Amino acid sequence: LTKQDNRSVYKTGRSPCFEIPTVNRPPRYASPVVELRQYTLKPGQRETLIALFDREFVETQEATGMTVIGQFRDLDRPNMFVWLRGFESMETRKDALSAFYGGPVWAAHRDAANATMIDSDDVLLLKPAWQGAGFDLSGSKRPTTAEAQSMSDRSRLPGFVEISIHHLRPGAEAGFAERFQAEAVPQLAANGARLLGAFISEHCENTFPRLPVRAGENVFIAVAGFDDGDSHAGFQTALAASPAWRAVRETHWAGSTKPAETLRLTPTARSLLR
C-alpha cells in the first residue's frame, strides 16, 4: 500500500485501484463499494438464518465500519437469502471484514449460520454506475430487534425490491450505464419504479480473499423499489405494454452476453433498503 496524490492505491495483478480522496468521499450511507451476496440455503432454513442474521449480524457488522444495506427473501427461490452490504473503500472493506470475521461475534455464531447454508460464494463486487447512483439510505430507519420480532406477519412488511442483473461484454459496462441512465431510467420512473441504485462491476482485486467473489464478471445492476408486490406487478404489466420500453430493450439489451436475471425480493423486518 502506497500513497499517491493523497489517495490509497492497491498494487494488483490487474490495474491499480485508487480509493476516493478523503476530502471528496461521499457520505458513509452511499457505500462506494457494494457486495451483492446470494446464499443458497438448505431446504427450510431461510427463516432460521434470517432470524439469526437480523438479531446478531447487523449492528455487529456495522460496528466494524461497513453498512448492512438490505436483507431479502427471494420470492422465486425459497432456499435463497439475498443481501447487500457496503463499504467506504476497498481498504475499509479489508479492515472491516478482517475485524468482523476475526472477532467474537462471528466466532460465537458462525457454526449456526453455516449450518443453514449450502453455498455462500455467489458474490458480486460492485461500484456505483454513475455519480449519485449509489444507495441513499440517509432517511431510512432500521427497526430494532424487538420491533422486528413483533412483525410476525411477513406479508405486511412494507416494500418490494427488484434487482436486475445484466451480463455484458468486457469493457461494456460504462457505455451500457450511460445509455441506461439516459433512456431506461425515465421509463422506469414513468411506469412506477423508484430507482434505488445502479451499479457496475468493481474490478479491483478482492482485498479479503478469505471470502471469494465472482472474478471476471462484467455486469450492470439496477435496483428498483416499490410499495408492495401489487405495485411491482402493475409496473411489469405497464412495461410490457410500453412501446418506448420495448425500444429501449431491443436497442440496449442486444449487447448482453446472456439474458438478464431478475430477482424479486421482499425485505426482512430489519432491512434498510425496501
Q: Model regions: which residues?
A:
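Compositionally biased, intrinsically disordered low-complexity segments enriched in Pro/Arg/Gln/His
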Residues: 4-7
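Short acidic/glycine-enriched loop/turn segments that link adjacent beta-strands
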Residues: 76-79, 204-205
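Surface-exposed interaction/gating patches
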Residues: 36-43, 48, 130-133, 139-207, ...
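Short hydrophobic transmembrane-like helices used for membrane targeting/insertion
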Residues: 9, 20-23
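An amphipathic, aromatic/His-enriched active-site/gating alpha helix that lines ligand/cofactor pockets
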Residues: 25-29, 48-70, 76-77, 86-129, ...
